[in-house]
């Protein structure tokens, strides 16, 4: 269980003293929205006000894009020697690490995730990601193509220009780093639009980047709502790429906006409905642990959460019992500033109501609640839902097909492998999957047959910055993480020279 050196009361005292920055970060400084408007950011932990945030619109996006374009064209970042880029980005990573408690508290207050995870996972992973990509600054080479003896063809990789990065609220720091790390090391300038539910840590990153030596205009952070700020960014004629993580519905809008504007490049990481296929010979203790942590971690607010269990009929009942035991014994729901809590608050009231509505839909469709199923801790003023198991779910049920994005796992059964594979692939999504079995031949058949960007065998949610992350089908295209992510922020130029 994650622990911290502070008690809940210590963190509450720190939270009471915190004065988060809510202004936009444009061209190296904090500025109010040009309209003067703000919106009130409340914490899902208890509903209290934590900041007034700049309610940015098209005019602020215009200012940020102009700053980024100017910085790109004059070469203040693009033309820096690789060793200097590396030094600045490594310094950026170190400043993130040094700001651990501050960033972790912002993240927890903003979105309701537990402080232990913000400290041990979100902030360190953000720093590690920036460091990982910094190391590529002086290790990436152009290529010489094999041509005739009197020709020289150099294949160069060049930055795209201005990148619009739109990130979601579930992992603000981590997903921001997934985007700005490779984009910056490639030599681009970035306009970052955090989700309106989670602007505070991204705004802090802007200042840390400035302290690290990143030139003005290279990283801009513009908070605001999707329709007012995200849409103008995606439609902007001077933005060369949109890198988006969020819902499939909005991802489709990004494609439309790209076509309606300048045919900018688009990379999408969208929704998921990841299946666990549990064969009859699986280690049920290991499977139950992987399933429980894979859906209840971060309150189920994870795009690749293992939200579907497809279990062999002979072991289903025992598996369901074991999942419930893991949830009850190892993943306590509690106040997010309590270091002992492993599940916290859902991000906002509307989202909590949506999750609860899906539990109701599932029971009306014929499923039974095998564990949890209710709102709890309502007296806090926050938005908490129990770890929930819906059993007896059929593949055609809405809860088996639609992304709930909360602490709800649905359980269905199969009797033969072909049926299980069909069920696993019976989804518009293809982000991730897992197969649990002691038979490696069966595991190979499933890893080959499942249409998903990541497939785990006898584990779940193992990850590394060295491995690409992204999905098939309506889970999107393009990959975050790994060296492969850098190339999506670059273009290829071939330079021919003829010799006599």
Regions found by a protein language model. Name each.
Residues 241, 249-394, 423, 457:
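ALDH superfamily catalytic-core signature
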Residues 32-34, 38-39, 54-59, 282:
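A short acidic/small-residue loop/turn micro-motif
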Residues 48-51, 239, 277, 343, ...:
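Conserved C-terminal structural/oligomerization subdomain of aldehyde/semialdehyde dehydrogenase
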Residues 1-46, 71:
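Hydrophobic face of amphipathic alpha-helices that form TPR/SEL1-like repeat modules
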Residues 47, 85, 107, 187, ...:
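Residue-level signal for inorganic ion chemistry
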Residues 141-286, 414:
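Rossmann-like NAD(P) dinucleotide-binding subdomain of oxidoreductase/dehydrogenase enzymes
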Residues 189-191, 369, 454:
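A short hydrophobic/small-residue beta-strand
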Residues 48-140:
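Glycine-rich loop-to-alpha-helix module at the N-terminal edge of alpha/beta enzyme cores
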């Amino acid at each position: 269980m994650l622990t911290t050196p502070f008690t809940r009361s210590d963190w509450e005292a720190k939270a009471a003293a915190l004065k988060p920055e809510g202004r936009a970060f444009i061209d190296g400084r904090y500025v109010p929205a040009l309209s003067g408007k703000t919106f009130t950011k409340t914490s899902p932990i208890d509903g209290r006000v934590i900041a007034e945030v700049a309610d940015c619109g098209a005019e602020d996006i215009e200012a940020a894009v102009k700053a980024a374009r100017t910085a790109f064209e004059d070469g203040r970042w693009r033309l820096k020697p690789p060793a200097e880029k590396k030094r600045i980005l490594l310094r950026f990573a170190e400043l993130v690490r040094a700001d651990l408690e501050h960033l972790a508290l912002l993240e927890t207050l903003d979105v309701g995730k537990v402080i232990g995870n913000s400290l041990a996972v979100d902030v360190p992973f953000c720093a590690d990601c920036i460091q990982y990509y910094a190391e590529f600054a002086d290790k990436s080479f152009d290529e010489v193509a094999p041509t005739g003896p009197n020709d020289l063809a150099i294949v160069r990789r060049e930055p795209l220009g201005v990148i619009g990065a739109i990130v979601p609220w579930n992992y603000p720091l981590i997903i921001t780093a997934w985007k700005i790390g490779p984009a910056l090391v490639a030599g681009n300038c970035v306009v970052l639009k955090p989700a309106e539910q989670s602007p505070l840590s991204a705004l802090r990153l802007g200042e840390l980047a400035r302290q690290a030596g990143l030139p003005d205009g290279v990283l801009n952070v513009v908070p605001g709502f999707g329709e007012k700020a995200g849409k103008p960014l995606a439609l902007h004629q001077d933005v060369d790429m949109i890198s988006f993580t969020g819902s499939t519905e909005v991802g489709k809008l990004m494609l439309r906006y790209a076509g309606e504007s300048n045919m900018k490049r688009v990379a999408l990481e969208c929704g998921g409905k990841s299946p666990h296929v549990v064969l009859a010979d699986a280690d049920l203790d290991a499977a139950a642990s992987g399933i429980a942590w894979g859906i209840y971690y971060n309150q189920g607010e994870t795009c690749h959460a293992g939200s579907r269990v497809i279990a062999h009929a002979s072991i289903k009942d025992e598996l369901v019992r074991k999942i419930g035991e893991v949830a009850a014994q190892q993943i306590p729901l509690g106040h997010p500033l309590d270091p002992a809590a492993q599940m916290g608050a859902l991000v906002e009231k509307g989202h909590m109501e949506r999750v609860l509505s899906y539990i109701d839909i599932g029971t009306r469709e014929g499923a039974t609640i095998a564990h949890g199923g209710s709102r709890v801790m309502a007296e806090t003023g926050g938005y908490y839902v129990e770890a929930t198991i819906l059993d007896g779910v059929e593949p055609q049920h809405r809860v088996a097909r639609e992304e709930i994005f909360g602490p709800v796992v649905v359980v269905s059964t199969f009797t033969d492998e072909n049926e299980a594979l069909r069920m696993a692939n019976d989804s518009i999504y293809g982000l991730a999957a897992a197969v649990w079995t002691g038979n490696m031949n069966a595991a190979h058949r499933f890893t080959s047959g499942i249409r998903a960007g990541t497939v785990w065998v006898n584990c779940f949610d193992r990850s590394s910055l060295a491995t690409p992350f992204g999905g098939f089908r309506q889970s999107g295209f393009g990959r975050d993480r790994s060296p492969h992510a850098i190339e999506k922020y670059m273009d290829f130029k071939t330079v021919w020279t003829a010799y006599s």
